[in-house]
């Protein structure tokens, strides 16, 4: 704030609570402006444009030097990584090369994830490349995963209480698992941001977010 004041920059720093997923663009709009993005809408619908730091820096470099986005800082971490690091690499770098630069994977490594712990996608192999949106590569050991065979919803409502989009995950799960497309549409499943908060809080260890991704695809196929 002091530097901004000294340079008389037209910038206001707005402190926010450290609460996941506060960094989501729709959540930021509401927290900062008090305006809520309508269902199915975008920040532009309420007069907002949201850019993160990486995008802002990329725009600056493109305008001042003509350099496109060709490099990426990737966090390689998790209990399965020998020596976790933050690495800057060219886009297109094999993930296996990043893991090698971190000393490789430990024995017993069970799961490899491209992305963060909440929204990342599980990978079956390290023979993939770093993309523009790759922010992290995580590896975890088998003894850390807590799974339940044939999980059943206990109707506790915790998933509803933590949903940042004010959806009802317990009903959406039922609709998606049974292929009830019209009900999925009425439940506004396309507004789900796949943050993973519902899956994280679920005491029954139900794979809610995974099922919502499936439900979204069912709805897209129906509307195609």
Model-predicted segments: where are they?
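Ferredoxin-type iron-sulfur electron-transfer modules in oxidoreductases and energy-metabolism complexes
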Residues: 135-150, 160, 164-224
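Short alpha-helical segments in extracytoplasmic peptidoglycan/chitin-binding modules
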Residues: 92, 97-99, 112, 163, ...
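Conserved active-site and cofactor/substrate-binding residues in soluble primary-metabolism enzymes
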Residues: 23, 50-58, 68-71, 90-93, ...
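Iron-sulfur-cluster electron-transfer modules
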Residues: 1-12, 16-33, 155, 189-190, ...
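Hydrophobic alpha-helical positions that pack around
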Residues: 1-95, 101-106, 116
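A short beta-alpha structural unit
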Residues: 116-120, 157-161, 199
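Residue-level preference for well-ordered alpha-helical positions
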Residues: 99-100, 203
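Active-site gating/interface segments in enzymes
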Residues: 21, 28-36, 103-154
């Amino acid at each position: 704030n002091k530097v901004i004041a000294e340079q008389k920059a037209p910038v206001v720093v707005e402190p926010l609570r450290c609460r996941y997923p506060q960094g989501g663009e729709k959540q930021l709009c509401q927290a900062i402006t008090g305006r809520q993005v309508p269902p199915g809408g975008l920040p532009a619908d309420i007069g907002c444009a949201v850019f993160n730091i990486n995008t802002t820096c990329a725009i600056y470099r493109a305008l001042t030097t003509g350099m496109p986005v060709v490099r990426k800082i990737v966090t390689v971490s998790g209990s399965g990584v020998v020596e976790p690091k933050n690495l800057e690499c060219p886009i297109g770098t094999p993930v296996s090369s990043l893991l090698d630069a971190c000393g490789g994977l430990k024995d017993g490594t069970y799961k490899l994830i491209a992305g963060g712990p909440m929204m990342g996608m599980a990978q079956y192999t390290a023979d993939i490349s770093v993309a523009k949106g790759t922010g992290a590569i995580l590896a975890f050991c088998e003894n850390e995963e807590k799974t339940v065979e044939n999980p059943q919803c206990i109707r506790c409502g915790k998933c509803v209480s933590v949903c940042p989009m004010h959806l009802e995950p317990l009903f959406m799960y039922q609709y998606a698992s049974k292929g009830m497309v019209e009900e999925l549409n009425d439940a506004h499943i396309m507004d789900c941001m796949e943050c993973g908060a519902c899956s994280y809080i679920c005491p029954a260890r139900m794979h809610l977010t995974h099922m919502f991704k499936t439900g979204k695809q069912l709805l897209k196929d129906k509307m195609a």
